Amino acid sequence: MKTLSYNIKIYATPERVWDILWGNETYNVWTKFFSCDSQMKSDWKVGGKTYFTDGDGNGMVSTIERIDEPNEIVFKHLGMIKDGQEDFDSEDVKAWAGSLEKYLLVDYNGETQLHVEVDIQPEYEEMMNNGFDQGLAMVKHLAEKLV
């Protein structure tokens, strides 16, 4: 497992950036650089369930390990969902189960420093770098557009 980190300064409040990251209307706009038709469904509870899926409903089953809106959220990835079936036990899943994805938003007088850390398998590094570079640039664009 490898941990990648990303940082971007956004000229908007943490509340605004949080809304862009997790809002129903904007989540799939910035995550399209990872997968077309990306969706996130969550009960927003620590220890609850969060699903990160593609347009076919396939993707990851995760939980929120820590949340302090609008300053921090940490997702723990637990398994996969494919064809409606959740998988927590296959060898593929065991290779990365327990990996974390962290978002930290720090307020500097109305500007936000967004820091992201994600645990990945090395073979996904290029995909993650491309996705986060383009995705976080889109978050910045969306957050600053209406400020």
Task: Describe each PLM feature range.
Residues 1, 49, 70-72, 109-113:
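A generic structural signal for beta-strand entry/edge sites
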